[in-house]
Structure formats: structure tokens, C-alpha cells
Amino acid sequence: RRAIRHGYRLGQKQPFFYQLVEDLSKVMGQAYPELIAAKARVAAVLQQEEERFAETLEHGMQVLEGALSRKIKVLDGETAFRLYDTFGFPLDLTADIGRERGITIDHAGFEQAMARQREQARAANKFTMQEGIEYSGSQTTFYGYETLQHEGQDLAIYKQGSAVDFIEAGDEAVVVLDQTPFYAESGGQVGDSGELLAANGTFAVADTQKIQAGVFGHKGLLRSGRLVIKDTVLAKVNPLTRTSTANNHSATHLLHAALRQVLGNHVTQKGSLVDANRARFDFSHNAPLTADEIRETERLVNEQIRHNWVVESATMKYDDAIKRGAMALFGEKYTDVVRVIGMGEFSTELCGGTHVPQVGQIGLFKIVTESGVAAGIRRIEAVTGTAAIDYVQQREAQLLEIAHTLKTSPQEVTQKIAQIIDNVRQTEKELTRLKTKLASSQGADLAAQAQDVKGIKVLAVNLENADAK
């Protein structure tokens, strides 16, 4: 960006930096052959970044010029941070520009603004159920990989963030169990819902979150009776939502592997959200997917579903998992021992989530949307199983309705629409021709109405529906 900015100062307003990739690959290609293999993609990404930064550079320079024009000796940290946060100006770039004008940067103020934003981001990312909850007891043992029902004891109950000894019907609370089959939200997979059945009460679990590492909080409402500390409960996960969520989670693993085959090995997962309704998958790629790429991705995923691979899970040391080719998510923190999920030879990933026993259970995979969420990050939303069938049937119903409106068959809708568009264009051309003809005939009559004003013929008249041309 500093190089681009210097080029900008020299009058180079078009992207230029990406052109160096060709020369770099010639000089360094023998030592780094992967650079030659990837040079087209590297150049494309660099060009895209240059084009984006050129836009922000122009707007950012206006802000910076406005601040520097105030005859100051020190640029305040808030302005420097705004340039960094909003326009992508690294602090050293702002410092370079200031140095040229004899102006220094308030580094301390910049760091304060940066620290404030980090704190706000941390606060926004905390689960709401964590607020005010202080727990110092034993951790929760998770049995949800093996079963959807398990007996446990409530170690703590929190009402409105405060620890209590019991709750009664109608109370909302967070219950901590020593053992549970409920999956707590993590890794992009939402927490389980279900119920806790005690001898004297029924607690409806709406969500499950980690209130600490290894401590599961079951958030919900006591529907009836009374729940007391140390009560033994039968924890029952809602099987329908768990199954649908597992379908979608396993589908994201297949999707990840398929995208790497279709688009290239540069594709890596950048985020996900998996619930009972759909799967959302963010990944690294610098361009929208074409219709053919989407179709090929869907074909590959559904082909694996038909293979009905057994989903295998194993725990092993992190280094061993990576040696076996397991995909690890960039930026994710892993322990020394990790859980590996394999789906035939098609997909192997590190994952702590819940999955189907065999991929055939997914049934059907259908991409609903593909969009961009940030520079170099694309997002796919997809549905599986019954939801995918419902989606296809809804689209089929829409097509039938359109065909009925156009008085044609579904197979000929595209041809019919093209015909209508062509007819409209022809009608517009004919209308223009008739207007021109009418104006010409009117013009001949109007010419006779011109008045002589001091030797100049003048005609003033109001024409309805006349083309200004």
C-alpha cells in the first residue's frame, strides 16, 4: 500500500504493482516453484487489492489533507485511527505522509483508540448468557457424540446472572450440569435444545452455551414444578433439531472439500454458522462463483452423499492429524489432542462438532445463495435434506406459476420471455418511428404558422408527447 501510494503521488492512478508478479516468478521461481504455479492467481488478487485500495486512498487522502491543512504539528491519534480503521491506511503510511509535511503522529492516542475498539469487539463477541455468571465448580463432561439422553446432576443454577439454590415454574435460568449430551455452541455450530427432566420439574432448554471453557450452561425456562441444586436430571436433546444440524454440519465439510476441487487449494474456511435450518459457509476466494462452478460444486457434494461414506471420528495428536492430511482452520486454536472427522477419501478435517453417522443421511444438498462478505471472502448458504426438497419444490412451483402467466410450458419459459422482450423492443422502435412521422407532418403545418419578428421567423408552440430530439 505504501508503494501504491507513492505511485499515486507520481501520477500513476491505474493498478501497476500486480505486474511485478511475472518478473518475481522469473527471478524466484526456481527456488519457489509454487510461485510460478500460482502467479496468475497472485496477480489477480493483487490487482483486485490495488483497485480497492485506490478507491479508499482517494477518499482517505481527502480526510488526511483536511486534517493536515489545519496548520498542526501533531496529527491526533483519533484521526490516524479513523484512517486505519475506515480507509485501511497503515499507521506507517500516515506517518510517511505526515513526515513529508513536518507533522508527527500521536502514537499514544492511536494505541488508545485501537485498544478501545478491541475491547468493544471482545464485549460484542461474549455470549449474553455469560454476563454476570461466575462459576468455580467442576467442568461438564460431554456425552453428546454417543447419545442424545444422559443422566446428570445440576451443579449450579443462575437466575438473572446470580447463583440461586432453586427455581420455580416460569423462571428463566441457566443450569450447569456435571454430565450432558447437549452440545454447547462452538466451531460455528449452534447449541442444542431439548429438556431436563427432574423428579419434581421440567426445564425446557432453548440454547446451550459455554459459560467457561469446558463448562456448559443450559439456558431456558422451568415449565413446571421446581428445580433444586444437586437434583438429578435426565437430559434429553431434541432429536429433530440435532439431526438437522448434524446434516448441515457434515454438508459443510463436503462443501469445503468440493470447493477446493472446483476452485483450487487456496480455498480455506473463514467462518461458518450451522443450525437446523441451513448451513452458512465463508471461504477465501477473490471472485464470485460462476453458474458452472456452483453447479459443479453441488454435483460433487451430492455425488459424495450418494456414496454414503461412513463418517469416522478419531482423536489423535495435532501433529499426527496434520501429517494425515486433516484440514485445520486458519486462526483456530487447537489443543495437543484433537478430534478428526473423515468422510471417505473426500474430506478429513479437525472438528469438535456433531455429525451424521453416514453422509447418505444428508439426503440432498442445494446451494441457495452465493455472495461476497468482505475483500477476498465469499459466502455460500445451503440447505440439506427435507429443507432442500422444500426449496426445490418452491422454485418448481414458482416456475409453473410463471409458465401459467405466460401461457406456455415450463420448458419453454426462457424462449417465451425472450420472445416477449423482442416484441417489446420492436414495439418501442415502431412507436419511435410513428412519433417521428407525426412530428414531421405536424412540422409542415406548424411552419406555416411562423411569425415574422423584425425579419426573423419565430414559431412558439406547445407540442404534446414530443421527443426533444
Summary of predicted features, one role per range:
Residues R1-K469:
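A glycine- and charged-residue-rich anion-binding loop/surface
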